[in-house]
Amino acid sequence: MKFTFVTLFQNIVEGYFNDSILKRAIQKEILEVEYLNPRDFSDSRHNKVDDSAVGGGAGMVMNPQPLFDALDELKRVDSEVHILFLTPVAKSFKQNDAKRLSKKPHIAFVSGRYEGIDERVIEKYADEVFSIGDYILTGGELPSLVICDAISRNVDGVLGNSDSLSVESFETELLEAPSFSKPEIYKNISVPSEYLKGNHSKIRSLKLALSTCKTKFFRPEQLLKHKTQLH
């Protein structure tokens, strides 16, 4: 699977792929990552990529020309590339989106800066637009990485143990049950005794109960979705 990051700040993004699971996936050629800088496509004398907002307003807006040319080149090389834009005004990215998008062969993330991207770019090139939450960041690179990570771990071969995907939060609308490590007792705090007895049927039942309690406490709306799903 190939990811293209359309960004003014490649250094912010590429460091994320220098360690751990995604680095290994790149080394195994399961994932491929490339970068496209809109500044390289600017036709202004000083490679300018932003301008003041038409109609007034604070701050600068990424102007259309560099992004139009960059994305035209991207689509010229691969007409099937799936282009994502990240903005807090869009729908929230969900686990089901990560699973669905993991089947795409090539995804591009367009990262905004300043006060955002000229809307004409989004209207022309966006296949999908997502938000990662109701808050504002200084740029789109971090949201792009969040979504890229969520997608990547659903790509076959990226995780060492693919079974771990099936028990994670949101796979059944319930949050994942609590996890514990060794030692079994630490500072007088013990792992639930049922975990230690080796009865896998009872362990599964306990995990389901703990998962349900956790969901009810932290995300009650997810519990309602789970009950609806059962019916």
From Swiss-Prot:
S-adenosyl-L-methionine binds at residues 112, 132-137. This is tRNA (guanine-N(1)-)-methyltransferase. One of its GO terms (molecular function) is tRNA (guanine(37)-N1)-methyltransferase activity. Its main location: cytoplasm. Its EC number is 2.1.1.228. It catalyses: guanosine(37) in tRNA + S-adenosyl-L-methionine = N(1)-methylguanosine(37) in tRNA + S-adenosyl-L-homocysteine + H(+). GO terms for cellular component: cytosol. HAMAP family: TrmD. Keywords: Cytoplasm, Methyltransferase, S-adenosyl-L-methionine, Transferase, tRNA processing. It is found in: Cytoplasm. Belongs to the RNA methyltransferase TrmD family. The lineage of its organism: Bacteria, Pseudomonadati, Campylobacterota, Epsilonproteobacteria, Campylobacterales. Homodimer. Specifically methylates guanosine-37 in various tRNAs. PANTHER family: TRNA (GUANINE-N(1)-)-METHYLTRANSFERASE. GO terms for biological process: tRNA N1-guanine methylation. It comes from the Bacteria. InterPro entries: Alpha/beta_knot_MTases, tRNA_m1G_MeTrfase_C_sf, tRNA_m1G_MeTrfase_TrmD, tRNA_m1G_MTases_N, tRNA_MeTrfase_TRMD/TRM10. It holds the Pfam family tRNA_m1G_MT. It comes from Sulfurimonas denitrificans (strain ATCC 33889 / DSM 1251).
